[in-house]
From Swiss-Prot:
Record's protein name: Splicing factor 3B subunit 1
Site (Interaction with SF3B3) residue list: 602, 677, 1205
Residue(s) of cross-link: Glycyl lysine isopeptide (Lys-Gly) (interchain with G-Cter in SUMO2): 214, 413, 430
Region (Interaction with SF3B3 and SF3B5): 1248-1304
Residue segments, region Interaction with PHF5A: 547-550, 1156-1157
Cross-link (Glycyl lysine isopeptide (Lys-Gly) (interchain with G-Cter in SUMO1)), chain numbering: 413
Organism annotation: Mus musculus (Mouse)
Basic and acidic residues biased stretches: 104-119, 231-241, 291-304
Phosphoserine PTM sites in chain numbering: 129, 194, 229, 287, 322, 332, 344, 349, 400, 488
Bias (Polar residues) ranges: 342-352
Gene3D superfamilies xrefs: Leucine-rich Repeat Variant
Phosphothreonine: residues carrying this PTM: 125, 142, 203, 207, 211, 223, 227, 235, 244, 248, 257, 261, 267, 273, 278, 296, 299, 303, 313, 326, 328, 341, 350, 354, 426, 434, 436
SUBUNIT field: Component of the 17S U2 SnRNP complex, a ribonucleoprotein complex that contains small nuclear RNA (snRNA) U2 and a number of specific proteins. Part of the SF3B subcomplex of the 17S U2 SnRNP complex. SF3B associates with the splicing subcomplex SF3A and a 12S RNA unit to form the U2 small nuclear ribonucleoproteins complex (U2 snRNP). Within the SF3B complex, interacts directly (via HEAT domain) with SF3B3, SF3B5, SF3B6 and (via HEAT domain) with PHF5A. The SF3B subcomplex interacts with U2AF2. Identified in the spliceosome C complex.
A matching Pfam family: PPP2R1A-like_HEAT
Amino acid sequence: MAKIAKTHEDIEAQIREIQGKKAALDEAQGVGLDSTGYYDQEIYGGSDSRFAGYVTSIAATELEDDDDDYSSSTSLLGQKKPGYHAPVALLNDIPQSTEQYDPFAEHRPPKIADREDEYKKHRRTMIISPERLDPFADGGKTPDPKMNARTYMDVMREQHLTKEEREIRQQLAEKAKAGELKVVNGAAASQPPSKRKRRWDQTADQTPGATPKKLSSWDQAETPGHTPSLRWDETPGRAKGSETPGATPGSKIWDPTPSHTPAGAATPGRGDTPGHATPGHGGATSSARKNRWDETPKTERDTPGHGSGWAETPRTDRGGDSIGETPTPGASKRKSRWDETPASQMGGSTPVLTPGKTPIGTPAMNMATPTPGHIMSMTPEQLQAWRWEREIDERNRPLSDEELDAMFPEGYKVLPPPAGYVPIRTPARKLTATPTPLGGMTGFHMQTEDRTMKSVNDQPSGNLPFLKPDDIQYFDKLLVDVDESTLSPEEQKERKIMKLLLKIKNGTPPMRKAALRQITDKAREFGAGPLFNQILPLLMSPTLEDQERHLLVKVIDRILYKLDDLVRPYVHKILVVIEPLLIDEDYYARVEGREIISNLAKAAGLATMISTMRPDIDNMDEYVRNTTARAFAVVASALGIPSLLPFLKAVCKSKKSWQARHTGIKIVQQIAILMGCAILPHLRSLVEIIEHGLVDEQQKVRTISALAIAALAEAATPYGIESFDSVLKPLWKGIRQHRGKGLAAFLKAIGYLIPLMDAEYANYYTREVMLILIREFQSPDEEMKKIVLKVVKQCCGTDGVEANYIKTEILPPFFKHFWQHRMALDRRNYRQLVDTTVELANKVGAAEIISRIVDDLKDEAEQYRKMVMETIEKIMGNLGAADIDHKLEEQLIDGILYAFQEQTTEDSVMLNGFGTVVNALGKRVKPYLPQICGTVLWRLNNKSAKVRQQAADLISRTAVVMKTCQEEKLMGHLGVVLYEYLGEEYPEVLGSILGALKAIVNVIGMHKMTPPIKDLLPRLTPILKNRHEKVQENCIDLVGRIADRGAEYVSAREWMRICFELLELLKAHKKAIRRATVNTFGYIAKAIGPHDVLATLLNNLKVQERQNRVCTTVAIAIVAETCSPFTVLPALMNEYRVPELNVQNGVLKSLSFLFEYIGEMGKDYIYAVTPLLEDALMDRDLVHRQTASAVVQHMSLGVYGFGCEDSLNHLLNYVWPNVFETSPHVIQAVMGALEGLRVAIGPCRMLQYCLQGLFHPARKVRDVYWKIYNSIYIGSQDALIAHYPRIYNDDKNTYIRYDLDYIL
């Protein structure tokens, strides 16, 4: 529009032009009536579809219904719906928390299952086996055939079948891989199972009488690469066709009768987990589009195995489902989320394949309708799911004739079906899915809220601890209130054990203690079966915590002692649960496991242990073999190696299976690791048993044999080389023939044998083996590197190897291949490399090694610098700096200064290294001290607290060297700088500054110290209030040092002020702080006199806190020792008159420590304190008598031989009546006093007191007197001879020993 229209024609033309342009506009640019408006996308976001997030159709078949329902589906109108929310930029700024974030997760006690790796999770697939037969029961009678216990023969047969089955599976898998499996018969996929029992070695195509079904061209087109469905060719546990309810795989919808599929391995093997059928593996590829509404359901299944979903149409066969089956992840069939079982459906990880009567939780959890009693043991999610399921089942219930009559008017009748009509039995799904309906109403009714479930009690009644949701499946019977008198004896026993176990697992310590004592005392009464059937499933629980496991293991330990031989039928059960503890990462769990298996072996005996564990030795599962080997080693240590040797010999020479040989040799290895030098008497026998394994045809057996030899040699070090003569040759051949893991094991064995040899042999073997080691230096395998380093260290540590040989042959390739950045990253490699390098330095000298690595102190990788520094520190710590020349010394100081300044991590490697190097160089450091101090002062000003702390720590490491170099002026300057930094706010840094001041005070002395002590100490007094342990410890050490050496520089008033501050430090948790504090009281008392300090301390006896009072009594005793007892005793004895329990006990405690510390000086004070002790020993309060007995003990031991027997005899008359006390603390103190008196007044007097009660008619009296007599006898056996009472000769016997009457 160049110009404005003025005339009528121009205006008309302009209007026409605009209208033309408008008409030409693309229709799509307009806004439709039902479409959305244009919004600012950056404000409102832009979800295009108004139906986004909704499912727009329900698929007719499961195949169409994908799992990714939540992706943006195409809407009905193909348009998007705008979202209204905060601006995107703002949302991006808000940190989005991860889904289901649990704020309490880090404070929750960790579960054992959470930290297990894949290998250790095997333990949960183990089955707690049924009881075994005890051949030794009833004196070895023939067992009753009615007993269901499995014999050794049954177990071995089962093991054999499992092994055979696994081998056939492997062969089939290999054939399938190689494409050698051929179609034997076109109908192999749909062949019905044979009626008679099939033999293990008979394949499916040999079954007679199977009528083949012709495949239609449709089916053949759908199943390319058709393979026969052999019995072994199937993944166990899941029958084909059970994915869709009742569907027959590969069948068309018009097929009139469902065809059967072979019933897989209906019984999975011991280690097999039930899972889905492998897709396409058995020729059962389902048709492309199946309509599940038209399919004919199967009312009976050959193999149960479809987890019931709560929201599906009910089926008649719901009750027959496999209990607790867990679907295999990544299964062959994509399931619709509408048919999915809720995630929380019950199914514990505790194996559910348990045969026999071993309880495994509540089976009814997984059934469609639990009985009312089981409802209580569900978790809230399961309860909710069950409610929904029940409601849907109730609605879909078929109507009865009576209900139909009530609904329809009269005149209707039921039509008979036409002749020959075969119904499609889809409505069969709508038959009741609830075998035990819980009495629901029929027809229409007002839906009142169901309150019954809300009142379900999820906590046991009575005095029982809180029940966690995880425990409900084990303790559900306690939730049901029953009259126990109506129960059978077995049920009563079961409830009793349940209650005790719940108290032990979840109760308070007193409750736990009582329950543990009760279950131990009644163990034989309860019986082994009921006890283990409840304890062992608890130990297999996937939600068990460390503390709970510890307590349950303690229960087993206690009851094993009581049950003794009754435990035999349950040995395998216990081992299945306890063996995994032997490979636990927690050391204490491993020790507990060993303890249990050791006690079990002693209770059950060797024969039972061997017959029980023998089948597991050649188990196909490596996990079982590994844990069995470790358990056997524990049995050997418990019952002695000789008793197990014949068995081990047989196992290691087994011809049938290499697994048995492998496990037998592993047992020998584990025995060596477990028992150490205790194997020496049996070393030759053990070596002979396993030597043939070094030339076995199986690679794994050869490897474990070499590792076992290495373990035996390590345990025998430095003895026993002659026992290994027979294995040297095969080992020697082995290291030339093997590569990889085998070679690593053989090298390890040689490495442990060389240190046992004489020097000349060691030298020869080292030179020979070194060629192979140097070749393996460049191996990329981490395990090989560790072993090579270890062997180099062992070879170079032996006497026969010369330094020259190491310098020329080993060091160049060693540094080339090992001193690399990668080695510093792995902790185990790092440690091994440092140790090996230090060992090489011990042979060739410090300078040779340090000169090769000193430049690496300036490397850019910090972890590598740390490795270099640690090596230098250890070498110089061992060898000093004598052979380090001036040039190397400069490089070293320069390097460590650089490394120290560049460090960023918070460990002490650099600090320790710096300190060690500087101290090793000694006076040679003087030229570098200004540079070092400059660096330290600069870093004390750094804004980073960590840097300041390291600088202060470095001063305390180098103070001694500064003194050696006579740099007192420099130290004085440092002291002033540190004094100025006492206002530091970070406690870690303040602690280091105090430590540095303490180091300077120690070396420079009190009189030369700057700042002067009179200025320094008042500055320290307020710091004593700091509650940080590091600050407290360093501060009290510094104050104590000043009080000891420079007390005269500070006024008495300041020391008293410090005394009051010190009382607070007696509350410290750390023992070192309390010890330093009580010692400081002694120094202060020495400086300013005992009276003021003593007054402060005596007042502190009145406090409530026990730890505080005990420390105060120790301080009083130290003051007495420092300032002579006569300055303290009058005030102390006067304080005893205060009629307060704590004060009197404190005084007695002080006297106890006082007499312990002053020893023989006590002879001057014994008569003074006797009246006080008389009173205390007659007091009603037990603690008074206990403490007074302790005083008598220390006093009598101190004054032995100083002629104070009269007073001590007087005190003995007061101590003696307390011998009948039952309190363990009191009786311990009384026995201690009697021991002390035995030394001081002689065993004769004690024997005279003792003889009165040795033959007393009352047993309790005799017990006490014999206990006292035994202790006198142990202490003074020879001295008693002269004091036994005279018994005169009679007609038959001569009792008098005349030679004892001779007097010269």
